[in-house]
């Protein structure tokens, strides 16, 4: 199996595109971030569950986010086993000042390429998340492994930057107006997604009942990255569109629906426009993000406890009912 990438030129613009055995594929996947921000020992069972659930959701690509850390060999062995392509970023996030000890950084790049280059799942190198590359990084990577594609960061060479990160009216995904940065349902997007409320059981693991309901904004925002995803405001307003809730049980149930509708809409839009089928040319979507590093009020298709949310069910149902039956 030969895996590569190229710039696909179409009447509707140009786009980065994964190629397998010379044929373009639609990259459907998510962004893998640290499994546990508390830095407790990583569990092979947890890693396997996360990657097997990715395949259950019909993903074919996993992006190793440059703002995290390098997974161990077991992660890449599993990607080989499960047929997941790996978009591999190196250890830089948005710091354009670069490390003080650049020689040490390049030594780390060299050891990483040597460790990973024999994995068939490894599809693509990206020097950083959202930063310029350290001088010499590209030449070193290409010298050590000239069989894979390369780009400087996740937002260049026909690849869009991320957004919207917040919940919006689902129709905005269809209308391509969900992001304040402009059109995002075009080409290849490695970082597009929206949060969903975790299960009620996980919410009760996050905070005391007195802060859970009525919603204590200060506490909820603390468990939402300082309110980054607007779970206590915008998300709450979207939930209230289905009627004011009288309990956390009622709010959590409606909150699952809000998250599911957004995830369903996002995947429907990209699926409709994949490759040359729709109104716009889309070659890939990697959902931000794949896994929760801590217990928090902003989950994705599953929460920190690995409990599937309604977003996962609707993603699976978009392609086949069989996968949803397995959950």
Question: Predicted segments — roles?
Answer:
Residues 176-321:
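Substrate-binding clefts and catalytic carboxylate motifs of secreted carbohydrate-active enzymes
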